[in-house]
């Protein structure tokens, strides 16, 4: 397990960044999850679940199934568990994507929100995700930091851990190499207006934030080969 990543995301958990990530990404996450076709009896894995907000959204769809969230940060997982006590169809585990502690062909759907670019060995992680999926199952990932969304490139120098800046074509190729088919890429827009008095540490200016919003989040999905 990547100790540098675990340490950093444990710090994020203590700083409340799991909850701020929900505030920032939930409008896009809701749209992405709605497009996945999760059924009431689906078996779903949320990779890089953080504080578990997307896991709980998925659990609302798979209310007669099961949703498992994993994260490399034990402190994020603890917060996810504490926030999900009302959900009987949810569980969480501390694990990294490159070595998933699950059986082959276990899940009908896999979701990942804002985590792919942190993986040290993304090809291995994608192959592991493919391994644990049932044939014909859907994997959908959302990322904001990608080559075509230039405004997000400024994040790279502010992060304490290395990240992978990839293009849409890069992601498509990696999905294909991992065994996925029927690859789709689409943009999802956050419908909230940008405040006139926007100030934040995420972007250097309001103009940068507007450009980021206009470019949209990248959702890339693929089906596990039958």
Residue ranges and their predicted role:
Residues 144-162:
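Short, glycine-/aromatic-enriched active-site segment of Class I SAM-dependent methyltransferases
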Residues 197-226:
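Core SAM-dependent methyltransferase catalytic element
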Residues 111:
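A conserved beta-strand element that flanks and buttresses the S-adenosyl-L-methionine
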Residues 163-179:
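Short alpha-helix
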Residues 1-39, 53-57, 76-79, 83, ...:
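Conserved class I S-adenosyl-L-methionine
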Residues 123-135:
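A short glycine-rich, Lys/Arg-flanked "PGG" loop and its adjoining helix->strand segment in the class I
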Residues 43-99:
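Class I SAM-dependent methyltransferase SAM/SAH-binding core
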């Amino acid at each position: 397990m990547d100790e540098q990543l675990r340490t950093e995301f444990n710090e994020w958990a203590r700083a409340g960044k799991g909850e701020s990530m929900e505030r920032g990404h939930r409008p896009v996450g809701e749209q992405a999850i709605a497009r996945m076709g999760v059924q009431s009896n689906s078996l779903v894995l949320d990779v890089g679940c953080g504080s578990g907000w997307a896991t709980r959204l998925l659990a609302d769809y798979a209310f007669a199934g099961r949703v498992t969230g994993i994260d490399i940060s034990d402190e994020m997982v603890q917060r996810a568990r504490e926030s999900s006590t009302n959900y009987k169809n949810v569980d969480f585990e501390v694990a990294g994507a490159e070595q998933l502690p699950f059986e082959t062909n276990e899940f009908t759907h896999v979701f990942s929100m804002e985590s792919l670019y942190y993986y040290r060995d993304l090809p291995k992680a994608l192959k592991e995700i493919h391994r644990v999926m049932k044939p014909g199952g859907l994997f959908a990932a959302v990322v904001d930091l990608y080559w075509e969304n230039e405004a997000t490139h400024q994040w790279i120098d502010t992060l304490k851990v290395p990240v992978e800046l990839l293009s849409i074509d890069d992601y498509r190729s990696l999905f294909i190499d991992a065994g996925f088919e029927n690859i789709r890429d689409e943009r999802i827009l956050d419908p909230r207006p940008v405040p006139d008095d926007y100030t934040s540490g995420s972007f250097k200016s309001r103009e940068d934030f507007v450009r980021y919003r206009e470019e949209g989040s990248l959702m890339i999905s693929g089906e596990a080969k039958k």
